[in-house]
């Protein structure tokens, strides 16, 4: 008899599945972020201003929030693969529309479809890890997916900007559309041998429940709140890091970019830290990561007084933040197979809401009181998440122990 969290999975490391999900998130993240360096060329092509074209970034983010609750439940009711295919199809169509757009309204339509697709694909990708990846590999695979966000920032955006500058901005979107086609082919191939085609239907479960029922699943409210605390603290701090570093060091954007790249290198190590967390225990690792982040955010504004200390601090911040994101997404995806898609939609919603609030609320604080005060507030918010992680570990740590015992058996 299979339990709620232990549907049949592949016993070996799912290379193709991990590649498909990682590439898909990489493409979604790259397309979301690549607009920024392409804005001047887009404004020239469509005979508009940069601030108007910048609305396409906001539109993408809004449609992500719409896509998650609108399309992710398809994975709970029918199958994850179907939801992935719908998301990828919308992504390809939207990206092709952007590449071929002859006017501003058509370009905005393409961006809206691409954002809707990302809202469906990303939470479903997290849910698929819980469905299809053996417990001993989940942290590693989730680490790969999480690191793809960092790879999108470090490689995807500069590559897209280089292609746009060397050839034409349209080629950037054509290449992302090709990546989408490649991911769709991998998902179709994986779906052929999937034993988990219908989410819960084969085990005689009732049809997928409501979002309210998903929110009532044990552990979910606690770890969604931790996600919000972590992401609010992170984005509140990260949004003004570059500006602060430019004030402290001479060299402008170049020097600030190099320091931020150190953070990106640390963030990209999530595949290794996730693998270590698989062995050490996910909830226990989360408590440690949140504790380190709480201290680090409070101290980071003072780190520029020592260059080696700043580099080490940024590297540790990247490692701990990527580990936290990996652990939270893994823990939440493992809360319930029956409601997994909706739970990950809540995870996506909490993350995106934190992005908006963190940067918006900390802006006036930074201008009036400085970066050190921003660090204290973000550390306090993260500390709230740490307290909740301790509570979650004491309340639900038997789940980790149960899964480890099952794995050994």
Language model features: what each stretch is:
Residues 110-151:
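Cytoplasmic helix-loop-helix junction between adjacent transmembrane helices
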Residues 66-104:
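Conserved MFS/SLC helix-loop-helix module at the cytosolic interface between two early adjacent transmembrane helices
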Residues 68-79, 270-281, 366-367:
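Helix-to-loop junctions at the C-terminal end of transmembrane segments
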Residues 16-50, 71, 237-242:
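Extracytoplasmic
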Residues 335-371, 378:
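A late C-terminal transmembrane helix in Major Facilitator Superfamily
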Residues 90, 94-97, 105-114, 308-316:
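Paired small-residue
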Residues 283-328:
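C-terminal transmembrane helical hairpin of 12-TM major facilitator-type secondary transporters
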Residues 106, 135-137, 143-191:
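Helix-loop-helix hairpin linking two adjacent transmembrane segments in secondary transporters
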């Amino acid at each position: 008899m299979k339990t709620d969290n232990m549907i049949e999975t592949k016993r070996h490391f799912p290379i193709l599945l991990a590649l498909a999900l990682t590439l898909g998130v990489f493409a979604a993240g790259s397309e979301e972020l690549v607009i920024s360096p392409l804005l001047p060329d887009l404004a020239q092509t469509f005979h508009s201003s940069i601030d108007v074209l910048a609305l396409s970034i906001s539109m993408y983010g809004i449609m992500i929030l719409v896509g998650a609750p609108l399309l992710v439940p398809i994975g709970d009711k029918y199958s994850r693969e179907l939801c992935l295919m719908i998301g990828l199809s919308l992504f390809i169509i939207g990206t092709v529309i952007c590449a071929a757009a002859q006017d501003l309204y058509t370009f905005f339509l393409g961006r809206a479809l691409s954002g809707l697709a990302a809202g469906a694909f990303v939470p479903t990708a997290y849910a698929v890890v819980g469905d299809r990846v053996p417990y001993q590999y989940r942290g590693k695979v989730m680490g790969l997916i999480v690191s793809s966000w960092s790879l999108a920032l470090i490689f995807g955006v500069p590559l897209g900007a280089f292609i746009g500058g060397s050839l034409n901005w349209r080629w950037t979107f054509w290449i992302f559309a090709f990546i989408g086609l490649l991911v769709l082919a991998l998902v179709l191939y994986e779906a052929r041998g999937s034993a988990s085609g219908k989410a819960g239907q084969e085990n005689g479960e009732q049809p997928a429940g409501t979002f309210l029922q998903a929110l009532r699943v044990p552990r979910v409210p606690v770890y969604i709140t931790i996600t919000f605390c972590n992401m609010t603290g992170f984005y509140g701090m990260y949004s003004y890091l570059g500006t602060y570093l430019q004030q402290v060091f001479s060299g402008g954007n170049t020097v600030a970019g190099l320091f931020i790249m150190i953070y990106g290198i640390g963030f990209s190590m999530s595949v290794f830290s996730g693998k270590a967390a698989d062995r050490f225990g996910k909830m226990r690792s989360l408590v440690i990561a949140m504790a380190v982040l709480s201290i680090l955010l409070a101290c980071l504004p003072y780190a520029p007084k020592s260059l080696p200390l700043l580099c080490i601090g940024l590297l540790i911040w990247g490692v701990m933040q990527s580990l936290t994101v990996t652990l939270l997404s893994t823990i939440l995806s493992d809360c319930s197979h029956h409601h997994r898609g909706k739970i990950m939609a809540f995870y996506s919603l909490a993350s995106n809401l934190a992005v908006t609030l963190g940067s918006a609320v900390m802006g006036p604080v930074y201008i009036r009181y400085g970066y050190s005060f921003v660090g204290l507030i973000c550390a306090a918010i993260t500390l709230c998440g740490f307290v909740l992680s301790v509570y979650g570990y004491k309340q639900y740590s038997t789940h980790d122990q149960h899964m480890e015992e099952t794995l050994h058996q």
